[in-house]
Amino acid sequence: MKKIFLQILLAFISFSLNAQIYTEVEEVTLKEGTENDYEAFESFWGVVKEKMISDGYQDGWFIWKVDPTSFDGNPWADYLIVNVYKDKSQMESMNNKPQSWWVDYMKKAHKGKSKRSLIKKYTNETLNNKYREKSVTYTNQRISDLSGGGNPSKGLVGYYHGIEQLNEDYIDFELKFFRELHKGRKLWWEVNKISDRSDNAYKPVTHMIFEINDENAPSLESNFTNEMMIKYGQTTRKIHGTLKTTLVNWRWQ
């Protein structure tokens, strides 16, 4: 299978070494009966996000659909929306935009591309919150990432892990052991520190890992060092839950 990923979570490699990547991950639970229309709604927003990226307001946007078999068939969200920013300043600038700015910008993004009736329809659906039953947001500060190269592709499968740090050795294990272990085995891997979250977010998690496996990767070498490092590395963290997700829409720099 052809290696597929990653500039995807966002053309990270082109960023300045001094830039601190920030992502906002929104865990969305849909209102009953809206499932069939939701992805078309996000496609409308994809046009807006494409202009935002072109205008330098953000660096990436990804919509991941959650596999309903995740978390023993009881996933805590239906979709993940990931907005990527080159730094904290860029993120805060967007978060401070008033509603009127967004309404005007949506119209500008779709001018000459969509009928006025369609723009009005999706603008109203946005303002009236037609689709979201529940929305939980985490603000993440990138610690490290690893790319196996390639490009995003619809249907790409990724795994989203909520992590609790258990002791002071956790990040060292992630960066000095697990990251090295993933080389040649992951199309993408990232570890983030949760710097903020919405009031309704899950409190125990401190970090988030997102990864995309390489199905053609060689088997992990079984030896004493790897076994012991994995054993003790796992004592530094607790995985509170994992969502299997599929990429359905994206825009990136």
Report the location of each language-model feature.
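Short S/T/G/P-rich N-terminal loop/turn motif that feeds into the first structured element of a domain
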Residues: A19-Q253
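Bacterial Sec-dependent N-terminal signal peptides
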Residues: M1-Y22
